[in-house]
Amino acid sequence: MSTTKLDSIKDNALAAFKAAPSSKDLYDLKVQYLGKSGSLTEIMKEMASLPKEEKPLFGKKVNEVKQLLEAAYTEAEDALKKKEISAKMAAEEIDMTLPAFSQPKGTAHPVNIVVEEIFTVMSRLGYSIRTGPMIEKDYYNFEALNIPADHPARDMADTFFVDKTHVLRTHTSPIQIHSLENEELPLRVIGTGPVFRCDSDISHLPNFHQIEALCVDEKISMADLKGTISFFVREFFGPGLKTRFRPSYFPFTEPSAEVDCSCPICKGKGCSLCKQSGWIEIGGCGLVNPKVFQAAKIEYPKWQGFAFGFGVERMAIIKYGIEDIRLFPENDVRFLRQFVK
């Protein structure tokens, strides 16, 4: 009777293991047949009622069935795990036919776009890019540029002083002095970076960006300066634009001039951007003052040079017809999206 019951347990367990739909169901069957209170454990208790001579044979058969069921369980467990992994992978498979999610395009800031375009134009003329410290010594920001402590030109810019001898640079002109002191002549450099002044309104920011170009060679004249700027204006704003030079004053250049170009928006006909004049001021320029060469220990008149500087935000305003300079630092995506390259 016990042998017949043992065979029945074996057959039922093998069939159940094979038919188990999941790993959890299979484990429950293992507990049912092979657990401490399972069917095999219960049938072992019946050995006590068997004759003494039958007990060894019956015990051996129970162990054989147990080993068989354990092997069958392991085989069924492996098969179910593979099946479940395959099902999971199939469920997670990427359907390449599904429509893709559109990603918004990143945009370069208009200031960076303008700087890159200026560098592209000037590099064609042999100019190399330079930068300088934003916290500058008073000497480089003023004195080396022919602006001593008692010079009235210091009133032209309200300055952020870090301490008695250091300032947040008010212009990028100090890059000229660093280049003259540290580089071999002749040289053509263009510097850029943020500058700082105590000023803020519709056309001024306390923190804005400048471009500063310097050319030094043995024979430099005002004609070279005018030709370079005229070429730059046409390449940057577009062909057909005119330039004009008005006498002005800067301590670090002599002679000095303000540079105007015909309005690229209205082509000189008159509009709100150029205030109906047809002309827009874009920056200042001049031949390098001999005192600047003297401060940098450069022999003059053997070496001569010219320099010019533009406000980057102003160049962007003129090129793109932007009405308020205060839009640049706000980082409003509605504004920035208009400049996707």
Curated annotation (Swiss-Prot):
UniProt-annotated binding residues for Mg(2+): 254
Gene Ontology BP annotations: phenylalanyl-tRNA aminoacylation
Cofactors named for this entry: Mg(2+)
Keyword Plastid: no
GO cellular component: cytoplasm
Enzyme nomenclature, EC number: 6.1.1.20
Compartment list: Cytoplasm
TM annotation in the entry: none
Top EC class of this enzyme: ligase
Transcription in keyword set: no
GO molecular function: ATP binding; magnesium ion binding; phenylalanine-tRNA ligase activity; tRNA binding
Reactions catalysed: tRNA(Phe) + L-phenylalanine + ATP = L-phenylalanyl-tRNA(Phe) + AMP + diphosphate + H(+)
CDD domains with a match to the protein in the record: PheRS_alpha_core (cd00496)
SUPFAM superfamilies: Class II aaRS and biotin synthetases, tRNA-binding arm
Assigned protein family: Belongs to the class-II aminoacyl-tRNA synthetase family. Phe-tRNA synthetase alpha subunit type 1 subfamily.
Subunit note: Tetramer of two alpha and two beta subunits.
Name of the featured protein: Phenylalanine--tRNA ligase alpha subunit
Organism (species): Bdellovibrio bacteriovorus (strain ATCC 15356 / DSM 50701 / NCIMB 9529 / HD100)
